[in-house]
Amino acid sequence: MKSMKRWAPALAVSTVIAVGSFAIPLQASAVDLPDLTPQQVMLLMDREITGFSGTIVKTSDLGLPALEMSSMMSKDMVKEMEEKMPDGFDEFIPNLIEQNAITQAVELISGTHKIRVYASEVGMRVQVLDRMSQRDVIVNENEMWTYDAKNAIATTAKFEDKISAADKTKIEADAKASFQEYAAKLQLDISNPEAVADYLMKMIGETTNVSVGKEHRIAGRSAYQLIAKPKAQNSLIDSVYVSVDSETGMALDVKVYSIEQENPAFQVGFESISFATPDASLFTFTPPAGTTLQTLEMPAELEAELATLKKEYEAKYASKEITESDFAAKKAELEAKYADQPKPEMIGEGWESVIYLPAIPKEVPMEMLENELFADLLTQVPGGKVFSTPVANVLITDTGNVYAGAVTIEFLQQVATR
């Protein structure tokens, strides 16, 4: 992990977004920075960061109610889901419901939370600071931990199969060569950051209006503001505001606005931040006394299958390049293996792209959709039912098809009838 820059903004936005999303109000003190174009702000974001720590405030206004999964799942529904799980995952569904993990995930996406983040080249630690408790995720080169202080449960997984330095160098070299080959086809000089920024702006500009907003302060730091406004008429997204640290180029704050409401639907941003490298001890964890310890272990059948695949790969491809025909053969093999599973398709592109599923995955019991609590989340529309939020809609048609996207309900209905 030579460059933290490649994943630091994703940690502050993506990790925390899969964990929720947000921003903080702009601070009143005036900021006077040199004027930059959108391309120049993007170049600023290419700077390398080796470590940081800070407190993120996460809020979202999605209109999601509090859900208690245990009250939504009958014993028969749980049993049905168990039977459909792969061998070795028999206890997965009961444990998930007993620990209320799904409820916690939904609750984390909605509402407001404070999240403490530590990151460096040797690890990452995320602490969700609840009112009466705390949840931690710790990742280093050797292991991963999650800790729920409220329920006194710790879960760990070891990273046993490490990539050797030689293999890592080869992977990086192959990736760089592939990228350079692709760039050559585009007639793009990837050694020229300005050229890359211009190319990205040209691509983005086909679907999005991008501009630079007011200079301001976030977490005590001066920042530029990139504003993206979709050109698509059927998008639920009105605009996205990204605050970029004027010195480090790190994304400090993100706001996502919906056409459905005035307040941001998603906000994720730093309340405080330091770019000093956190102490390595923060990326280790010892469960407190009295903690229930769980170890994530791969089911024996799956582990054996992966071991077989590894041997096949080493025997077949270790001494030669993988060709397109090799990929085609593997694709055909996987398609045959999962032929009975509904396959997602992408309809359209850009801000109006829609994911289509010909059926609800068989692992989801249909009785769950008829549960009173779950049914309250669905709105009846001509041709089906819709689960709606300010930034995404999911249409389940009367015939069992599923359409989902960050688009209006009317647009989903149009796509469904094409």
What are these regions, as identified by a protein language model?
Residues 129-154, 162, 238-242:
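Single conserved position on a long alpha-helix in the C-terminal lobe of the eukaryotic protein kinase
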